[in-house]
Amino acid sequence: MTAATIVLIPGLMNDGWVWTGQLGSLSRMGPVYVACNDGLTTLADMADRILETTQGPLIAVGHSMGGRVALEMIARAPDRVIALALVSTGAHGARETEAASRQTLVDLAITDGMTAVARAWMPGMMSASTPEETRRAIQAMIERADAKVFAGQQHALLNRPDRLRFVASLCLPTLIVTGDADTWASPTQHEELAHAISGSRLEIVEVAGHMLPAEAPDALTTLLHAFILENLQAQQSSEDANFASIGTE
């Protein structure tokens, strides 16, 4: 059996650190690939990079922008993605109000640096209950981001395709997770996603905002572990059945 690779796709300004709370548990389940979206300016190119640098079946787990990248992966290689987890994300196209606000942050990054971006961006992205230690770690991650990489990712998001009709056509196991305090990608937005994707399951984590993987790592890990285990077992059962049918021909 070719074991499915668990692909963890970070969001805007995020690197692999955002998945620190999940890596230990998930890496014991099978191969894990942490994607890097740096240097690319379209979601399509981000998806292509992942598909080109991995092999075989994939379980795609995307946070925020990473969820949109996961949808582009499915659009390009539907036979390779066997299960999907969407975390604090969406499928709609860019709204009219986004261009100005995103450009303001890009300009701030170029003129004042990523520390200034972190200070401007972070307050509305986390639950008020998020510990100070977690806040500092998230700020450090944002400060590590390159301003030009940040600008490229913002370009990708402003020019993203509207995938609302596409998600309604999905027919693969899908877990949708959000925080109850996410004001950027609201629980209502995720309820709409769950309604659109047939057979999907929605989980709302209490006392967590948009930076859910870091804010509520244990809760998210528990949800992902159960979902991924279920789909790895289904993959094994399917391959066993195929092998048995070949043996009787």
Regions found by a protein language model. Give the residues of each.
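Flexible "cap/lid" loop of the alpha/beta hydrolase fold
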Residues: 43, 75-76, 80-119, 125
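Short alpha-helix in the alpha/beta-hydrolase fold that links the catalytic acid
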Residues: 172, 186-195
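Short beta-strand/loop motif that positions the catalytic acidic residue
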Residues: 170, 176-178, 182
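Conserved HGGG/HGGXW glycine-rich cap/lid loop of the alpha/beta-hydrolase fold
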Residues: 1-47
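Catalytic active-site module of serine/aspartate enzymes centered on a nucleophile-bearing elbow/loop
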Residues: 200-249
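Conserved alpha/beta-hydrolase catalytic His-Asp/Glu region
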Residues: 94-97, 112-168
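Gly/Ala-rich beta-loop-alpha elbow adjacent to hydrolase catalytic centers
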Residues: 62-66, 70
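Conserved acidic catalytic loop of the alpha/beta-hydrolase fold
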Residues: 43-58
